[in-house]
Structure formats: structure tokens, C-alpha cells
Design a protein with these regions (language model features):
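A glycine/proline-hinged amphipathic helix-loop "lid/cap" segment
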Residues: 1-66, 222
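Short beta-strand-to-loop junctions in surface cap/lid or active-site-entrance loops
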Residues: 60-72, 229-234
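Short beta-strand element of the alpha/beta-hydrolase
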Residues: 72-83
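Short amphipathic alpha-helix adjacent to the substrate-entry channel of hydrolases
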Residues: 90-110, 125
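Gly/Ser-rich "nucleophile elbow"/oxyanion-hole loop immediately N-terminal to the catalytic nucleophile
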Residues: 135-150
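Alpha/beta hydrolase fold serine-hydrolase catalytic domain that processes acyl esters and thioesters
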Residues: 145, 161-250
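Short beta-strand immediately N-terminal to the catalytic nucleophile in serine-hydrolase-like folds
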Residues: 150-152, 181
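Gly/Ala-rich beta-loop-alpha elbow adjacent to hydrolase catalytic centers
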Residues: 152, 156, 160
């Protein structure tokens, strides 16, 4: 197992010294504001990209493109993390910019509805609908439909996977690949990694469970999209797993 990066190790030490506070103890507004404030940890903002916020068919998107990009590009449809209850363009802007610059891809982030205001399957429906909208508008957006990747972190990883599975079931079109960044795939928090990494690494087992509880309050555990153990897509890449609670699923 790799050692923690120095700055992260310091944050973990401070978290433990503070008594391992849980996001469950915060009201939803404070929880969301804290997530926005944490965006400073992502470092400097990449400026060598073009950023456009657009609305298509009632859903908001942030389109981040390499400068002077012409013609259809490989495209990453991105779903932000936040335990289904927080996050958005403000929390992930730096990551989206960096991804577009470093990859040379067009990156299109989908803003989905959050719990507790909107519960399951609202976020999943928005994620799937967002992907379909992007593909329908591929030409004006400059999207190469043969090279679409679905990606997301944490709750967004869940949304990317379920969107791919829904597309497969519908038999319409498929993404070229998935990129799942420490995805939330176990709504029961019962896997080995939840047990071994569930207390000390800031994003705790209780924090994730509190997000699931707000998003899935009336969902039967037998529902096929109540992700516990699920078959991973054949062309799937997972990142950031060494100390994560979700490691057991990749």
C-alpha cells in the first residue's frame, strides 16, 4: 500500500486529532458549503482551457475544452462526487479544467439533482438523461460519438456506472470506456475496505452512509440500482483506491 501524500497525511492527522467529526452532524447547507470550501485543496486553476456553462433540455452542463480545439473531440462526460447530497461545478471546476488540458479531451460535466431535496432515482435519471442529451447534441458540442467516456468520482462514479448499464440495457449506444474514481458502489458499507478504512481517512464510513440514507430513504435493497455488488464494465479504469473505503469493488 502506498504512503499518503504529505499534505493529505497532515489533513488526516488533523482530522483524527479533532475527534473524527462526521458530516452527519452538519446541516445540509453547512455540509455543502464545506465541500465548496475544500476546493482550495485542488491547487491552482488551469487557465489554458475554454469554459462554457450551458443549459440543454432543462439540464445544466459545464463544457471545458482545450484552447483552440476544432472539430469533434474525444469527450469525457463527468459526474461530480459529493455523496449524492453536495457538489457541483464549484467543487470540481479545477479538476475538470485539468482533465481537459492534460487529456486533450472535451470534458462535459452534468449537474444532477441532489438529496435530500430529490431522492432516488433523481440523480441517476439526470445522469442518464444528461448523457443522452450530450449525444443528441454531439455535432454542435463538438463531441466525437465514437469516443465518449463516462467518468465520475465517489457518487459520480456510481452514476457513471449505472448510466452505462442503463444504456447497455436500452441497446441504444455505449460509451467507449468508464473511468471510476473511488466510486461509491456499496450502499450497505459492508465491504472489507469500508471496515479497514472507514474511520481515519476524513471521508468516513458514516459520512458515506449518511449520504446514502438521504438519497435512498425509501429504496428497497433488492432494487437492481441499489448498488451493493455489481459487475464492473469490461473497459473500466479505477483510480485512487489505496486508502479508500470503496477499494473492495475495483
Amino acid at each position: 500500500m502506498m504512503a499518503l501524500e504529505q499534505g493529505i497525511a497532515r489533513l488526516v492527522e488533523e482530522f483524527i486529532a479533532a475527534g473524527r467529526p462526521s458530516s452527519r452532524q452538519q446541516n445540509i447547507d453547512d455540509r455543502r458549503a464545506g465541500y465548496v470550501a475544500s476546493a482550495v485543496l485542488a491547487g491552482e486553476s488551469e487557465t489554458r482551457v475554454q469554459v462554457d456553462d450551458i443549459t440543454l433540455e432543462g439540464i445544466n452542463f459545464r463544457v471545458v475544452s482545450p484552447q483552440n480545439a476544432a472539430g469533434p473531440l474525444p469527450t469525457v462526460i463527468y459526474y461530480h462526487g459529493g455523496c449524492f447530497v453536495s457538489g457541483g461545478f464549484a467543487t470540481h471546476d479545477k479538476q475538470l479544467r485539468q482533465l481537459a488540458y492534460e487529456s486533450g479531451c472535451r470534458v462535459i460535466a452534468v449537474q444532477y439533482r441532489l438529496a435530500p431535496e430529490q431522492t432516488f432515482p433523481a440523480a441517476h435519471n439526470d445522469a442518464e438523461r444528461g448523457a443522452q442529451i450530450i449525444r443528441r447534441h454531439a455535432e454542435p458540442l463538438g463531441v466525437d460519438t465514437s469516443r465518449i467516456t463516462l467518468a465520475g468520482d465517489s457518487a459520480g462514479g456510481n452514476l457513471a456506472l449505472v448510466t452505462a448499464l442503463r444504456l447497455k440495457a436500452a441497446g441504444t449506444w455505449l460509451p467507449a470506456q468508464l473511468i471510476l474514481i473511488y466510486p461509491m458502489l456499496d450502499a450497505t458499507a459492508a465491504s472489507a475496505s469500508y471496515i479497514s478504512n472507514g474511520e481515519d481517512y476524513i471521508i468516513t464510513r458514516d459520512t458515506l452512509l449518511s449520504g446514502y440514507e438521504m438519497y435512498l430513504p425509501a429504496t428497497e435493497s433488492a432494487h437492481p440500482e441499489y448498488l451493493h455488488r455489481i459487475n464492473i464494465w469490461p473497459f473500466t479504469t479505477g483510480f485512487g483506491m489505496s486508502f479508500k473505503l470503496m477499494r473492495s469493488f475495483m
